[in-house]
Amino acid sequence: MRISPLIAGLIGGFTAAILQALFKVFPPPAYGICIACHTRDLVNWIINHLFGTTLGMALVSKAFPVLTVVGIFIGALITTFIYKETELKQTHSPVYWFHIRNFSY
């Protein structure tokens, strides 16, 4: 059975809403839109726990980090393997791209 992106999104959204209500987790209002805060909170949580610092993060991430960024990377990795996007492709002008890559710094 094939699940369309719409159905997968609806299932994920409703599941997230139910879990949020169940665990009484209320992040800031824009937390589901902007992923920059998720990355900041994950990095700051790791640094705080490794080095004992007190870098700022959202209250929802104080006890356990928001792993949205990790989920996006894992999903992207799975998608690249499904659609075989890991194969190298031949460029049209190898000499041009050689110079761009090596001398553009």
Swiss-Prot record:
Transmembrane segments: 3-23, 41-61, 63-83
Membrane topology: Multi-pass membrane protein
Main location: membrane
Compartment(s) of residence: Cell membrane
UniProt keyword annotations, A-Z: Cell membrane, Membrane, Transmembrane, Transmembrane helix
GO-annotated cellular components: plasma membrane
Superkingdom of the organism of origin: Archaea
Designated name of the protein: Uncharacterized protein MJ1590
Species in which this protein is naturally found: Methanocaldococcus jannaschii (strain ATCC 43067 / DSM 2661 / JAL-1 / JCM 10045 / NBRC 100440) (Methanococcus jannaschii)
